[in-house]
């Protein structure tokens, strides 16, 4: 799943350089959503992972 997020992030960066339109706008939207999802999962796993190993 992380590889898909990185792939869409790269597509979004290329789309931003070339201009937002059509598939570029869609890829940017997907990359933003995946970024937020993985950020939330990272924060949750960070806090619960620290508490479980003690």
Curated annotation (Swiss-Prot):
Record-linked InterPro entries: DUF1328
Top-level taxon: Bacteria
Signal peptide: none
Pfam families linked: DUF1328 (PF07043)
Keyword flag Transferase: no
Bilayer-crossing regions: 4-24, 29-49
Any single GO CC term annotated in Swiss-Prot or TrEMBL for this entry: plasma membrane
Subcellular location as annotated: Cell membrane
Keyword terms: Cell membrane, Membrane, Transmembrane, Transmembrane helix
The keyword Transmembrane appears for this protein: yes
Family annotation (NCBIfam families): PRK13682.1-1, PRK13682.1-4
Similarity-based family: Belongs to the UPF0391 family.
Protein name as annotated: UPF0391 membrane protein PSPPH_0249
Classification lineage: Bacteria, Pseudomonadati, Pseudomonadota, Gammaproteobacteria, Pseudomonadales
């Amino acid at each position: 799943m992380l590889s898909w997020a990185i792939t869409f992030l790269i597509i979004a960066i290329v789309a931003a350089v070339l201009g937002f339109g059509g598939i570029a706008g869609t890829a940017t939207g997907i990359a933003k959503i995946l970024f937020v999802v993985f950020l939330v999962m990272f924060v949750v796993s960070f806090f619960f992972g620290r508490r479980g190993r003690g």
